[in-house]
């Protein structure tokens, strides 16, 4: 079977992890110990981090801070009510029209944009995330290793990742199973069906504790099953990786029947994110036509806000910033309070050539939405466009005190230093951005350029030299790991 680029990238990342000394040193799992002892949370996190480095480089990865912020707020609302609240999670989106979601080792959970658009309510989307969170908190990867009891850990990990981590696409699962060197695949798949039932049960409890409508889980899964029957061989990807049985649906229904009905309103951000994704789907003019048609339906004020937001995004994508500004003005008239409206307004002003107005909007928004990364990025870009590098540098320096691991902010800081003509600091900041993205060779190259910049002092050059030694050591360690594979 031919693997797509993302599949090949993830399998490569898995291979790097399995070739590492830590992986080899693990030895066989001790069946007398707990799942936590068989595969440590630290090892799971390391596997997940390695795979995420490859995912972030792939075009399918949706590098949209507003979508990521929404998913992480929603996911953290759920995970904070889990019995394993110490587990770290990161939620991200893949630009893929299929209906799928998947949990990877270490608490990384991916959601296809097609699934976000298919969810009719926020509780339905939360139900899917709760199910995936439960795969992580119940330590299904570690328990799968414990169940096997034979074969090398590397092979078991490959198979486990195929089942639990590589569910983003069926062909990736096949490829990872091939990397597992033909273990007893069917027995492990049967075991994973038990995990699906457990994830249903734990996820439902998590959904209820987080004050969502628990009927959202049954409604979404029933709709997926109906869709699968209608389209047979073209069933949603979620069904191929999360097989639904009548028994599972009946069990969900029985559990839900005993709970009182609770109507839970959707957040504004849920509707705005879906409108943004819809506006980015297909041809720009088709998106404009769809939102104009929906606006003509005279929806209630809450729904009108999402439609006008989506229409503004569609106009912007179609190269019509003046029309987009009219919709933003209508959102202001409706008194819609959201950081997504502020960033949209700033983007529209930038497209109309008014960088100063864009910067003013986001300066006003930053104190109100201090944790919104899209606001911080937008402010930096507006200040740079307005040729105000000193103001931008102050914003970047303050921001990196709170978010030192933000690769994008380091990259924006590098652009700021370039505008100021400070070459050493430009290359140093860009090196940090590359290092945080796992692009160590590019980071080393930037630091070498910083060494030759000719505009630094003794202290700055010493810092560059020290950081370059660290990066080179990491590169040497990785080369040794590949050699010992």
Question: What feature does the model see in each segment?
Answer:
Residues 123, 133-150:
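Catalytic Zn2+-binding segment of zinc metalloproteases
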Residues 153-168, 175-183:
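Membrane-active amphipathic alpha-helices enriched in small hydrophobic residues
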Residues 110-127, 189-194:
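Short pre-active-site segment immediately N-terminal to the catalytic Zn-binding motif
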Residues 110, 124-132, 136, 178, ...:
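Short alpha-helical catalytic segment bearing the HExxH-like zincin motif
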Residues 2-102, 185, 227-230, 325, ...:
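Hydrophobic or amphipathic, alpha-helical segments that drive membrane association/targeting
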């Amino acid at each position: 079977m031919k693997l797509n680029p993302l599949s090949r990238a993830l399998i490569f990342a898995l291979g790097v992890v399995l070739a590492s000394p830590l992986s080899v040193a693990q030895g066989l799992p001790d069946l007398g110990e707990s799942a936590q002892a068989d595969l440590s949370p630290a090892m799971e996190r390391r596997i997940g981090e390695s795979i995420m480095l490859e995912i972030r480089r792939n075009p399918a990865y949706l590098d949209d801070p507003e979508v990521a912020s929404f998913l992480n707020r929603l996911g953290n609302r759920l995970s904070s009510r889990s019995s394993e609240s110490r587990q770290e999670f990161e939620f991200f989106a893949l630009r893929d029209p299929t209906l799928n979601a998947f949990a990877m080792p270490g608490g990384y959970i991916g959601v296809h944009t097609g699934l976000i658009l298919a969810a009719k309510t926020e509780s339905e989307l939360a139900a899917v995330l709760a199910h995936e969170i439960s795969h992580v908190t119940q330590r299904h990867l570690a328990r799968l290793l414990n169940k096997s009891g034979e074969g090398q850990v590397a092979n078991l990990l490959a198979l486990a990742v195929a089942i639990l981590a590589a569910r983003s696409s069926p062909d990736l699962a096949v490829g990872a199973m091939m990397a597992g060197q033909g273990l007893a695949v069917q027995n492990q798949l049967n075991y994973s069906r038990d995990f699906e039932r457990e994830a249903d049960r734990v996820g439902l409890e998590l959904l209820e504790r987080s004050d969502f409508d628990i009927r959202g889980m049954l409604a979404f899964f029933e709709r997926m099953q109906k869709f699968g029957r209608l389209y047979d061989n073209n069933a949603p990807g979620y069904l191929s990786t999360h097989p639904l049985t009548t028994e599972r649906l009946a069990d969900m229904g029985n559990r839900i029947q005993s709970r009182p009905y609770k109507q839970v309103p959707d957040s504004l951000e849920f509707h705005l994110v879906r409108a943004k994704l819809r506006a980015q789907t297909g041809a720009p003019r088709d998106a404009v036509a769809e939102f104009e048609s929906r606006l003509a339906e005279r929806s209630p004020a809450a729904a009108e806000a999402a439609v006008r937001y989506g229409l503004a995004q569609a106009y912007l994508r179609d190269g019509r910033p003046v029309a987009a500004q009219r919709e933003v003005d209508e959102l202001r008239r409706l008194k819609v309070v959201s950081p997504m409206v502020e960033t949209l307004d700033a983007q529209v002003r930038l497209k109309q050539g008014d960088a100063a107005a864009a910067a003013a909007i986001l300066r006003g928004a930053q104190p109100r939405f201090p944790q919104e990364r899209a606001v911080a990025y937008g402010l930096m870009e507006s200040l740079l466009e307005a040729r105000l590098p000193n103001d931008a540098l102050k914003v970047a320096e303050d921001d990196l005190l709170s978010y030192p691991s933000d690769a994008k902010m380091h990259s924006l800081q590098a652009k700021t230093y370039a505008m100021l003509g400070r070459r050493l600091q430009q290359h140093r900041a860009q090196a940090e951005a590359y290092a945080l993205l796992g692009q160590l060779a590019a980071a080393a190259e930037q630091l070498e350029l910083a060494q030759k910049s000719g505009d630094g002092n003794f202290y700055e050059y010493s810092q560059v030299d020290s950081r370059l030694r660290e990066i080179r050591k990491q590169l040497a360690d990785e080369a040794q790991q590949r050699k010992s594979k």
